[in-house]
């Protein structure tokens, strides 16, 4: 087929298009395909018009040749069509079977997948049912909890109502105080005027005092001159005297006397005058000085008063300013209303005049003119009255509106108070939770202590047992020694016959007997008291009592040993036999009483053990039930931080179960919602043309509304697209702005609770919260992380706990750091503070969520008005822009109003009157509240306000501080004015750019609609007031957040009543540190880590506490967490640099053309805000580093801070002025350029590229700012760490490693900063710019490559349009970029190199655009030239008029028509095939999409199956662990019981030993009796050997008993050792069961009661062979009686435990009751056994009772028989032997009864749904797992079948497509063959259509 296509066909015309010679130089197409095929130009040869030359006429031969050629071509064409159809049929018949097979397989796979899906849904339904059944179990507990909660809520409501009443009273009092303050301001104004007048008078007085001082100086000078003149005159007088003395005159004496008199008189007068003048001058001078001092003091006082008055006047001025502002707003409203009234009156006057004119025209000719005038006057009066009434109604309505707004504000305040009370209740609840945790920890500690004590007691008991064994051994040796001594003393007894010694010894023994009686009585009482039942005490106290009883038993044994020594001594005398007999009777009675007490004690202990075991069993059953439920659910939910379930109580377990059930339900709903969203997305993927935009919008809206109903998501697609694209536009500009605010951190916690409640297209603020949260995380995380956080609330819980834990750590560190110069806190106060902070931090997030939701729903109505008022200057083009403004306004209002407005301005000074920091903050408030709302959203002056607040506490000079403060306020006012001016200029610039770029004019209706909205907003003063108050509160909170720590510390000095107000200030979320949100962490206002690190060093130097090491460890831990946060931040920055391009493309892709209109405004505003936020953050950091210095430096530092603030304010002013000048120049330039430019068309591709450039530049700037901040913070942290190392003893290696990590972080941050700043290294910015340049170059290269080859004129025109639009847009965009670059150079000190690179880039782009325009012009000219050549008239053709010629032409026309019809058929067939191909392609794409969907579902099903398998395995493992624990506890219980049994055996053995000793004593007593009888007889020697024989038999019996006792002790010790070995090995359950069966199978021999035929050798005893039964093969319990084989002789021998011959003993087989051995448990409350065993036991007990009664009778008859025997002096040994035999028979009966008792089993009967519950659960789980396996296998089969079917269908479609392609090529070839060769008939003529012509 390809040969037909590729071979050269002669019939094909030379030109590509139908026009001949349009493009002469274009080469032929390689494949021979005509680009204009199907257009109708080259399908038919126009022979009559094109092939014949116009100069030559056509003859008949030509016509005949033409006809024959046409016939041939027609025939060939038909043949080809026929063969083609046959070939197609053959090709289609071939591979159909394979296609059918694949189709069938695919169908099978689809069915299997459907089945699997159905089965999985059924499994999910089963799981939900199981969870609901579990939930029903805890229903009663939930109801109880609900009732308790209702009661608590009722109490809280009562409290809240009381507090509301109190607060209303406070409000009235505050209003009264306000009025008083208002009156006080007027009086203070008057006082200030008076003081100013007084000041002027004082100044005048001061000037008079200066004049007086000048006069005094002149007088002093005159006095000095007079003194000088006096001195000169005295010198003259002296000279005259000397001359006169030299003269010799007779009358010398007379003249000298006269001269002296004459000289003395004036001298004295002058001296007097001078002295008087001096005194006067001195007095005057003193008086003047005193007056000057008094005046100076008055001046100082006046100045002080003036300073205070200035301060007060400033405050009053501010208050007056606020009031005047309010009055101005009211006056404006009044003026507006007056203007409206005037307009209405003017309109009314005009209407009245019009009416009068009309009526005068009507009634000019009538006589009733005057009556009509009077009627009109009445009408006008009525209208006036109506107008008056309406105006009064308007006033009344305004008043009612004001009242309603006031009531609304009051209600909001009450709601906030209620929420505060709810927070307090939550805090109390969190306190209760903390106490519960503490109690749980204490319980665990107590358990550990109890276990340790049990171990200690076990060790003690073991030591006591070993000691008692040793003592028993010693006692046995002593007894043997005593028996030997008795034998020796029997011989010695015959020698002692002296009576005196007997009497003395008798007296001694009587005394000893009395003592022994007293002792035995004391022992009995002690024994009885010690053996009283312990009652309902714990096991621990019982074990203590057992140990004490054991010690008392040992003491009793010692005392009895002493008694036996006394008895041995007493045997030396023969006369003391009677006394010994009496004593033995008493001892026997005491022994009997003791045995009874021992039996009662054992019974009581058994009952107590049974009760305790029953209680434990019940607890373990309920405990295991709840623990199974909780562990199953916790395994299913994969909870990370769960406690061990074993330590929970029942209430906690029930609570846990209910919580987990709730979680499961929520997860199930989430799963359903996600399924819905996936299905909707898959459905929406095929709708409309805007597929990617809609997909992105629907994904985000449905993921935001994943937990909402379906009704709330029915929002218009256009609104969604506009909103989301605007969100994307604002995203990059709002990142830093959102990061610099603390409220955005709460968005992390709030966004899960937000709701989309507006169904008309305008979303509620909750959606914006989530949008803000996604914007926060957008630079750091990719989109999947945010979606995962939204869909998983448990992850959010974990993050919130981490954040709260970090907050708790930082607050714990910060608490107490401002106490350097104050008194130290006591540890108790510290603990209270820490607990207080903890409760606040625990209770905060939940309440904040509620506050955020409610507050924003309340504010939803008023906020869009604010946004429209703010944006009233801008041009709004479309409805989408209006929506964007709405949402922007809501976002800004949300940022401006803090959601947790816990600090109200009214209650702060009342609650915190003792805290100086609060007062300072409130004093400095009015300076900040004057800032305007738009720019004050960036908290620029937070730290200055803090320094002002601190100023009032420090002893700085008041004058300097007030001056600096006034200067700061002036600068703030100027800055505010400049900012408003700057914003107006920005708006003008944006308008000019919009007009220059040819934007559409804004809708007049929208522009006209804005002022009424503003007016409506102004009509509601309550709302405006609410906004103002919230903004001021926000500013207060911004200022107070930095002083939080000092307030916390000062609050501890205050009384505890003030502490209740502290939670409101602690609810500031800005102290939260999180390593996951590092960007928020860096740009947050309060950087606690730096303050902690610097202030912590001061604290470590000044405060030396006991827990210094813990403090240092805590600091190191905090530094490590901070380092981790920085490392995460660097990693996220790197990740962000990689993801930035993708994010930008997504942003540009979702943007529409109308959204691009508002971009420059947003961009400029965002840049301004980010730059100012960066500067603010740097300044905040600087002040925070300077903050925590030593107290000596604070005075100077405050002044320095204020000066620095002044400098920064001046710098900002200068910067604003420069920006304003620059903007003026830019506006002027734009207005000049606007005249020359016309609005051209723009292309979206160029816009997106320019937008990418601006966004990347903005991101580079933002990244540079973040790097600067983080580097500064890292440097401060390194310094703080060095100071900490110097101040404390930290491990050197750890500190060095930590310091190296810090240095590495700092170096990395410096590198990043250089990279962002310079851009010379291979950084993010250069990469993005280079990629952009390469992309543009590639586009231009392809364009230039396509220029010579473009065949159509439309393409060149489009390209020229594109190039011109590109040029015009780039010129505009580069101007914008130049402007943004200039602003960035001014604000952020960007590098000059980067600017030059941008300018160079712009120049190159302009050059290339100019070149492209030139090439477009050339192409246009060429096309015009070709068009002119094309329009040439075709030459006329000669027509012949012959009939032959006409017939030939008609035949030619007929053939031509036939040809055309055939061609049309071919074209139609090709079109049909094309349509079929398109349909097949569409069906194939649908099938591929469905296949992908099925594959995804299959993968999800597979994952779910794997998860279920994992959960099943984990549950099985957990069950095995529980079984193992139960087994271990059972082993422990069995071990304890075995020990108890061993101790009981030891006690019984001790009793037996005592009994044997008493029997020996009785024997010795009998011997004494016999000796006495013989002595009393006539001395004939020994008569008869019967008593001695009896004694001999008795002794033999005693020895046999002793041997038996020793063997029993040995067997018990071996049993104990083997039990310990078995328990130590931890053998399996079968072996343990075998051991218990074997232990129960060991039985005491069943001996028939034959008291007369007893022998010592035939006495039954336990042998060591009894422990051969521990073979596990023999210990298998038989299942039924029929299956138990009869025992052989060997078995009976091995089971019988007789040491002698087994003739008298019957075999004892361990019998299990049929079918009920599974119920056997050691904690059972029931006994199970055979009725034969029970009857035999009853028989043995009755026999024992009868024997005991006989023995009682014998003991009562014993003393009387002794007296009779003394009288008769005859031997009567019969009663003694009878008593001994009865004792042995009683012993045998007791042993037999004990053996019978062992044959009964303790069982726990199966209750309904209790016994096989666990097994049934495991069985159900296994069945479910197997079902799941089967379903999964079937689904996999289905999927495979569907895959095969789809592959088959793909192959079919491919085959069809290939066939169609082949047919298309054949048809094209056929068409070429049908065309004529004009050069064949006339080789001489040359066709103009050939390329050679």
From Swiss-Prot:
The keyword Zinc does not apply. It is found in: Cytoplasm, Cytoskeleton, Microtubule organizing center, Centrosome; Golgi apparatus; Cytoplasm; Cytoplasm, Cytoskeleton. Residues 1015-1071, 1084-1105, 1347-1381, 1500-1521, 1646-1706, 1754-1774 are annotated as: Disordered. GO terms for biological process: brain development; centriole replication; centrosome cycle; chromosome segregation; establishment of mitotic spindle orientation; microtubule bundle formation; microtubule cytoskeleton organization; microtubule organizing center organization. Residues 1663-1706, 1754-1766 have a biased composition (Polar residues). Residues 58-196 are annotated as: Interaction with NCKAP5L. Residues 1861-1870 are annotated as: Required for centrosomal attachment, Golgi localization and CALM1 interaction. Its main location: cytoplasm. Residues 1726-1768 are annotated as: Interaction with CDK5R1. The modification Phosphoserine is found at residues 547, 1238, 1490, 1663, 1666, 1893. Homodimer. Interacts with CDK5R1 (p35 form). CDK5RAP1, CDK5RAP2 and CDK5RAP3 show competitive binding to CDK5R1. May form a complex with CDK5R1 and CDK5. Interacts with pericentrin/PCNT; the interaction is leading to centrosomal and Golgi localization of CDK5RAP2 and PCNT. Interacts with AKAP9; the interaction targets CDK5RAP2 and AKAP9 to Golgi apparatus. Interacts with MAPRE1; the interaction is direct and targets CDK5RAP2 and EB1/MAPRE1 to microtubule plus ends. Interacts with TUBG1; the interaction is leading to the centrosomal localization of CDK5RAP2 and TUBG1. Interacts with TUBGCP3. It is linked to Microcephaly 3, primary, autosomal recessive: A disease defined as a head circumference more than 3 standard deviations below the age-related mean. Brain weight is markedly reduced and the cerebral cortex is disproportionately small. Despite this marked reduction in size, the gyral pattern is relatively well preserved, with no major abnormality in cortical architecture. Affected individuals have mild to moderate intellectual disability. Primary microcephaly is further defined by the absence of other syndromic features or significant neurological deficits due to degenerative brain disorder. This is CDK5 regulatory subunit-associated protein 2. It comes from Homo sapiens (Human). The lineage of its organism: Eukaryota, Metazoa, Chordata, Craniata, Vertebrata.
């Amino acid at each position: 087929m390809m040969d037909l296509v590729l071979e050269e066909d002669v019939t094909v015309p030379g030109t590509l298009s139908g026009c001949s010679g349009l493009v002469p130089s274009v080469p032929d197409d390689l494949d021979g395909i005509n680009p204009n095929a199907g257009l109708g130009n080259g399908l038919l040869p126009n022979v009559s018009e094109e092939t014949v030359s116009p100069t030559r006429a056509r003859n008949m031969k030509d016509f005949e040749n033409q006809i024959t050629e046409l016939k041939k071509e027609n025939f060939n064409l038909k043949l080809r069509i026929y063969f083609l159809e046959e070939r197609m049929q053959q090709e289609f018949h071939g591979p159909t079977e394979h296609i059918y097979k694949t189709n069938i397989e695919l169908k099978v796979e689809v069915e299997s997948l459907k089945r699997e899906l159905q089965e999985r849904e059924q499994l999910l339904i089963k799981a939900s049912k199981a969870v609901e059944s579990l939930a029903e179990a805890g229903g009663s507990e939930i109801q109880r909890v609900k009732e308790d909660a209702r009661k608590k809520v009722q109490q809280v409501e009562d409290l809240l109502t009381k507090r509301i009443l109190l607060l209303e009273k406070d409000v009235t009092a505050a209003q009264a105080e306000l009025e008083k303050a208002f009156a006080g301001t007027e009086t203070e104004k008057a006082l200030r005027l008076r003081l100013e007048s007084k000041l002027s008078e004082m100044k005048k007085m001061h000037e008079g005092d200066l004049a007086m001082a000048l006069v005094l100086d002149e007088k002093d000078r005159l006095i000095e001159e007079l003194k000088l003149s006096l001195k000169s005159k005295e010198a003259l007088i002296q000279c005259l005297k000397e001359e006169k003395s030299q003269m010799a005159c007779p009358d010398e004496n007379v003249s000298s006397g006269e001269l002296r008199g004459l000289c003395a008189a004036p001298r004295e007068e002058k001296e007097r005058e001078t002295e008087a003048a001096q005194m006067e001058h001195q007095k005057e001078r003193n008086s003047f000085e005193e007056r000057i001092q008094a005046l100076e003091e008055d001046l100082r006082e006046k100045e002080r008063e003036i300073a205070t008055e200035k301060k007060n006047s400033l405050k009053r001025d501010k208050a007056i300013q606020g009031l005047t502002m309010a009055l101005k707003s009211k006056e404006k409203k009044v003026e507006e209303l007056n203007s409206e009234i005037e307009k209405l009156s003017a309109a009314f006057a005009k209407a009245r005049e019009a009416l009068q004119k009309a009526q005068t025209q009507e009634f000019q000719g009538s006589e009733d003119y005057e009556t009509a005038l009077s009627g009109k006057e009445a009408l006008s009066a009525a209208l006036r009255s109506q107008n008056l009434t309406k105006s009064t109604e308007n006033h009344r309505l305004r008043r009612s509106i004001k009242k309603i707004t006031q009531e609304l504000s009051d209600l909001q305040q009450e709601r906030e108070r209620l929420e505060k009370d709810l927070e307090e209740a939550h805090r109390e609840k969190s306190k209760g939770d903390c106490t519960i945790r503490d109690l749980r920890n204490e319980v665990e500690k107590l358990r550990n202590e109890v276990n340790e004590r049990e171990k200690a007691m076990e060790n003690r008991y073991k030591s006591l047992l070993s000691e008692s064994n040793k003592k028993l051994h010693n006692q046995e040796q002593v007894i043997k020694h005593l028996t030997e001594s008795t034998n020796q003393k029997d011989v010695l007894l015959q020698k002692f016959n002296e009576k005196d010694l007997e009497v003395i010894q008798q007296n001694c023994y009587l005394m000893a007997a009395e003592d022994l009686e007293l002792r035995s009585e004391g022992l009995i009482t002690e024994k009885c008291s010690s053996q009283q039942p312990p009652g309902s005490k714990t096991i621990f106290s019982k074990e203590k009592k057992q140990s004490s009883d054991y010690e008392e038993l040992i003491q009793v044994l010692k005392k009895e040993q002493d008694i036996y020594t006394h008895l041995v001594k007493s045997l030396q005398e023969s006369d003391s036999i009677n006394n010994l007999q009496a004593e033995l009777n008493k001892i026997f009675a005491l022994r009997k009483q003791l045995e009874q007490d021992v039996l009662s004690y054992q019974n009581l202990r058994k009952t107590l053990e049974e009760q305790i075991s029953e209680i434990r069993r019940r607890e373990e059953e309920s405990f295991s039930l709840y623990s199974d439920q909780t562990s199953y659910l916790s395994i299913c939910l994969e909870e990370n931080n769960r406690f061990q379930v074993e330590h929970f109580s029942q209430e906690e377990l029930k609570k846990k179960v209910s919580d987990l059930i709730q979680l499961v339900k929520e997860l199930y709903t989430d799963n359903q919602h996600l399924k819905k969203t996936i299905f909707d997305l898959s459905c929406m993927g095929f709708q409309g043309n805007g597929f990617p935009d809609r997909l992105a919008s629907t994904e985000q809206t449905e993921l935001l509304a994943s937990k909402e109903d379906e009704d709330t998501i029915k929002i218009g697609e256009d609104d969604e697209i506009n909103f989301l694209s605007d969100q994307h536009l604002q995203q990059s500009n709002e990142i830093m702005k959102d990061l610099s605010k603390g409220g955005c951190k709460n968005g992390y916690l709030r966004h899960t609770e937000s709701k989309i409640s507006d169904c008309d297209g305008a979303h509620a603020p909750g959606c914006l919260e989530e949008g803000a949260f996604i914007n926060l995380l957008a630079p750091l995380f990719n989109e999947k992380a945010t979606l995962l956080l939204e869909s998983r609330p448990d992850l959010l819980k974990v993050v919130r706990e981490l954040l709260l834990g970090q907050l708790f750590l930082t607050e714990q560190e910060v608490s107490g750091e401002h106490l350097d110069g104050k008194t130290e806190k006591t540890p108790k106060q510290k603990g209270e503070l820490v607990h207080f902070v903890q409760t606040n931090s625990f209770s905060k997030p939940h309440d904040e969520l509620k506050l955020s939701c409610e507050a924003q729903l309340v504010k939803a109505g008023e906020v869009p008005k604010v946004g429209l008022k703010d944006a009233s200057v801008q041009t709004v083009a479309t409805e989408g822009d209006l929506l964007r403004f709405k949402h922007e306004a809501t976002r800004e209002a949300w940022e401006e109003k803090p959601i947790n407005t816990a600090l109200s301005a009214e209650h702060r000074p009342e609650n915190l009157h003792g805290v100086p920091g609060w007062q300072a903050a409130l004093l400095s408030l009015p300076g900040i509240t004057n800032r305007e709302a738009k720019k004050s959203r960036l908290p620029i002056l937070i730290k200055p306000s803090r320094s002002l607040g601190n100023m009032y506490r420090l002893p700085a000079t008041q004058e300097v501080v007030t001056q600096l403060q006034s200067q700061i306020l002036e600068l703030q006012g100027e800055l505010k004015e400049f900012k408003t001016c700057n914003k107006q200029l920005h708006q003008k610039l944006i308008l000019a750019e919009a007009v220059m770029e040819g934007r559409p004019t804004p809708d007049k209706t929208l522009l006209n609609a804005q002022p009424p909205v503003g007016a409506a907003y102004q009509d509601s003063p309550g709302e405006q007031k609410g906004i103002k108050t919230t903004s001021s509160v926000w500013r207060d909170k911004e200022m107070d957040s930095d002083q939080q720590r000092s307030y916390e510390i000062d609050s501890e000095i205050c009384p505890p009543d003030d502490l209740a107000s502290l939670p409101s200030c602690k609810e500031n979320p800005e102290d939260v540190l999180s390593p996951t949100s590092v960007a928020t962490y860096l740009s947050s206002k309060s950087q606690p880590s730096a303050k902690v690190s610097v202030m912590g060093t001061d604290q470590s130097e000044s405060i030396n506490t006991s827990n210094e090491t813990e403090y240092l460890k805590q600091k190191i831990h905090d530094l490590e967490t901070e380092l981790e946060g920085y490392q995460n931040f660097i990693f996220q920055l790197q990740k962000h640099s990689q993801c930035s391009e993708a994010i930008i493309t997504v942003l540009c892709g979702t943007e529409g053309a109308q959204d691009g209109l508002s971009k420059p405004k947003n961009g400029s505003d965002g840049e301004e805000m980010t730059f100012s936020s960066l500067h603010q953050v740097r300044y905040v950091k600087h002040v925070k580093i300077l903050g925590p210095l030593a107290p000596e430096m604070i005075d100077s530092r405050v002044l320095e801070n204020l000066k620095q603030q002044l400098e920064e304010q001046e710098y900002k002013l200068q910067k604003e002025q420069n920006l304003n000048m620059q903007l003026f120049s830019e506006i002027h330039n734009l207005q000049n350029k606007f005249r020359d430019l016309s609005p051209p068309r723009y292309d979206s591709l160029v816009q997106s590229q320019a937008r990418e450039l601006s966004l990347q530049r903005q991101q580079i700037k933002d990244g540079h700012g973040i790097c600067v901040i983080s580097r500064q913070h890292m440097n401060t942290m390194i310094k703080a760490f060095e100071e900490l190392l110097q101040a404390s003893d930290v491990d050197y290696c750890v500190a060095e490693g930590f310091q190296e990590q810090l240095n590495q972080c700092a170096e990395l941050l410096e590198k990043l900063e250089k990279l962002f700043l310079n851009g010379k290294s291979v950084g993010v910015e250069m990469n993005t710019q280079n990629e952009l340049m390469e992309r543009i170059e590639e586009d231009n290269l392809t364009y230039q490559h396509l220029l010579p080859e473009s065949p159509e004129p439309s393409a060149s025109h489009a390209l020229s349009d594109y190039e011109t639009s590109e040029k015009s847009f780039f010129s505009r965009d580069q101007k914008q970029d130049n402007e943004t670059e200039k602003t960035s150079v001014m604000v952020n000190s960007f590098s000059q190199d980067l600017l030059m690179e941008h300018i160079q880039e712009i120049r190159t782009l302009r050059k290339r655009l100019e070149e492209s325009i030139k090439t477009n012009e050339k192409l246009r000219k060429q096309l015009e030239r070709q068009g002119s050549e094309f329009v040439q008239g075709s030459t006329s053709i000669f027509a012949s008029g012959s009939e032959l010629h006409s017939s030939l032409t008609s035949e030619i026309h007929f053939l031509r028509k036939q040809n055309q019809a055939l061609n049309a058929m071919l074209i139609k067939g090709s079109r049909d095939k094309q349509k079929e191909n398109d349909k097949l392609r569409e069906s194939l794409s649908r099938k591929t999409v469905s296949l992908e969907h099925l594959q995804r579902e299959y993968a999800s099903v597979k994952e779910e199956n794997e998860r279920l398998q994992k959960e099943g395995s984990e549950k099985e493992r957990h069950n095995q662990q529980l079984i193992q624990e139960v087994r271990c506890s059972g082993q422990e219980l069995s071990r304890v019981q075995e020990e108890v049994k061993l101790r009981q055996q030891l006690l019984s053995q001790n009793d037996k030993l005592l009994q044997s000793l008493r029997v020996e004593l009785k024997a010795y007593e009998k011997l004494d009796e016999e000796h006495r009888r013989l002595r009393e007889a006539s001395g004939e020697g020994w008569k008869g050997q019967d008593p001695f024989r009896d004694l001999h038999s008795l002794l033999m019996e005693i020895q046999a008993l002793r041997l038996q006792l020793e063997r029993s002790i040995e067997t018990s010790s071996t049993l104990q050792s083997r039990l310990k070995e078995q328990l130590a090995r931890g053998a399996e359950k079968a072996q343990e069961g075998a051991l218990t069966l074997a232990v129960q199978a060991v039985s005491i021999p069943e001996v028939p009661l034959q008291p007369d035929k007893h022998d010592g050798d035939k006495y039954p005893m336990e042998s060591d062979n009894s422990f051969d039964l521990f073979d596990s093969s023999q210990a298998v319990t038989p299942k039924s009686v029929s299956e138990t084989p009869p025992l052989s002789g060997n078995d009976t021998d091995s089971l019988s435990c007789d040491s002698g011959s087994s003739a008298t003993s019957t075999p004892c087989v361990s019998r299990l009751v049929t079918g009920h051995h599974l119920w056997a448990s050691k904690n059972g409350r029931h006994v199970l056994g055979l009725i034969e065993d029970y009857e035999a036991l009853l028989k043995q007990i009755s026999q024992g009772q009868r024997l005991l009664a006989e023995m009682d009778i014998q003991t009562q008859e014993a003393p009387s028989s002794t007296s009779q025997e003394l009288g008769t002096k005859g031997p009567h040994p019969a009663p003694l032997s009878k008593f001994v035999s009865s004792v042995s028979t009683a012993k045998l009966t007791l042993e037999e009864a004990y053996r019978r008792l062992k044959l009964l089993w303790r069982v726990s009967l199966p209750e309904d749904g209790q016994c096989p519950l666990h097994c049934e659960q495991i069985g159900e789980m296994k069945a479910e797992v197997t079902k799941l396996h089967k379903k999964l296998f079937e689904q996999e089969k289905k999927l495979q079948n569907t895959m095969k079917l789809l592959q088959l269908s793909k192959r079919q479609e491919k085959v069809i497509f290939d066939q169609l392609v082949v047919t298309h090529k054949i048809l094209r070839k056929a068409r070429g063959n049908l065309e004529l060769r004009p050069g064949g008939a006339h080789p001489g003529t040359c066709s103009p259509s050939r390329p050679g012509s």
